[in-house]
């Protein structure tokens, strides 16, 4: 909405600097961070959600996160909100007509029609709200908690996924006391791996604190990797985790150190790996990536990734149902 002026000059840094010096001496100034986005918003060229998406594009660290932000900047989320607003206005108009002519023998919509309209709007809001699980995970990274008993190879697994010795590995049980977080890009999606303290009964106060942090990491993870090893299986250790999981959490049970017991039968539903020599790691990467369905990103579907948008939709849904 503003008239621009473009200066084409020689590529010399001195010439560019001199032009900028002359312009600023004549009253011009350098643009501040995000100033062109602000001007576009104030001029009505972008709405607030599109302006927020500009920052998300700049901060995106994966192909999926970039596609998500680009879709929002193109107006995908704005279009979904516009459709929602139209439905709400239609419902409001019907309610106002009923109130204005309540004493007349005129019925513009019966209660069943109004209830059905409210249910459709509620379903629209819920669909947007539910997309936040995927949107936020793509934007912030999919949280994956690596859990299990001490010395089953959790830190070795993280090092193998990173292809570097990032985490200290030791034969001494309880070496990992704090949660170590690392980000890994798997086929265009960022995963946040949380290497946690081994879970066991202990009197060590410091180790107990580490286990408490492990449980907190499990609670906020989208995917939980529960690790055991071939020796523990042979000794009758439980295959399934002994801590509760949410219904929406994905669980992977890994049997590590299969190279030390190649004849050990794997229980149904488990995945055999060797974090030390890399056996099964590529298969694990593919399984993790399959948990994140990004097809909707490339079809233009509206996906919520902003906490403010999610809270506003939650408030709208609550108000509709009151």
Regions found by a protein language model. Name each.
Residues 63-186, 202-204, 220, 230-322:
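C-terminal-of-GTPase-core extension/linker across diverse P-loop GTPases
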Residues 44, 151, 195:
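Conserved G/P- and acidic residue-centered "switch" motifs that form tight phosphate/ATP-binding loops
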Residues 207-231:
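Inter-motif core of Ras-like GTPase G domains
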Residues 1-50, 61:
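N-terminal accessory targeting/assembly segments
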Residues 188-205, 210:
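Conserved nucleotide-sensing/catalytic segment adjacent to the nucleotide-binding pocket
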Residues 193, 227, 254:
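Generic enzyme active-site microenvironment
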Residues 191, 223, 252:
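Short, Asp-centered acidic motifs that coordinate Mg2+ and/or phosphate
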């Amino acid at each position: 909405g503003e008239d621009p002026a473009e200066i084409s000059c020689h590529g010399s840094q001195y010439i560019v600097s001199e032009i900028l010096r002359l312009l600023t001496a004549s009253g011009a100034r350098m643009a501040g961070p995000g100033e062109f986005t602000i001007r576009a918003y104030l001029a009505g060229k972008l709405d607030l959600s599109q302006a927020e998406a500009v920052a998300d594009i700049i901060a995106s660290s994966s192909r999926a996160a970039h596609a998500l932000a680009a879709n929002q900047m193109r107006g995908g989320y704005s279009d979904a909100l516009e459709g929602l607003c139209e439905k709400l206005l239609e419902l409001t108009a019907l309610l106002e007509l009923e109130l204005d002519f309540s004493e007349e023998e005129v019925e513009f919509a019966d209660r069943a029609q109004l209830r059905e309209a409210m249910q459709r709007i509620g379903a629209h809001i819920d669909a947007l709200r539910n997309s936040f699980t995927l949107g936020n995970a793509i934007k912030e990274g999919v949280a994956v908690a690596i859990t299990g008993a001490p010395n089953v190879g959790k830190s070795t697994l993280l090092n193998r996924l990173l292809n570097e010795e990032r985490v200290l590995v030791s034969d001494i049980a309880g070496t990992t006391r704090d949660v170590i977080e690392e980000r890994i890009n798997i086929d265009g999606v960022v995963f946040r791996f949380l290497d946690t303290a081994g879970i066991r009964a202990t009197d060590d106060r410091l180790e107990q604190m580490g286990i408490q942090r492990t449980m907190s990491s499990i609670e906020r993870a989208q995917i939980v990797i529960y690790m055991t090893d071939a020796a523990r299986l042979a000794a009758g250790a439980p295959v399934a985790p002994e801590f509760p999981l949410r219904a929406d959490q994905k669980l992977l049970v890994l049997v590590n150190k299969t190279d030390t017991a190649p004849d050990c039968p794997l229980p149904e539903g488990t995945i055999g790996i060797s974090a030390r020599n890399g056996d099964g790691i590529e298969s694990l990467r593919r399984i993790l990536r399959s948990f994140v369905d990004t097809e909707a990103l490339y079809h233009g579907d509206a996906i919520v990734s902003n906490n403010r948008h999610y809270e506003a939709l939650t408030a709208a849904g609550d108000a509709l149902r009151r």
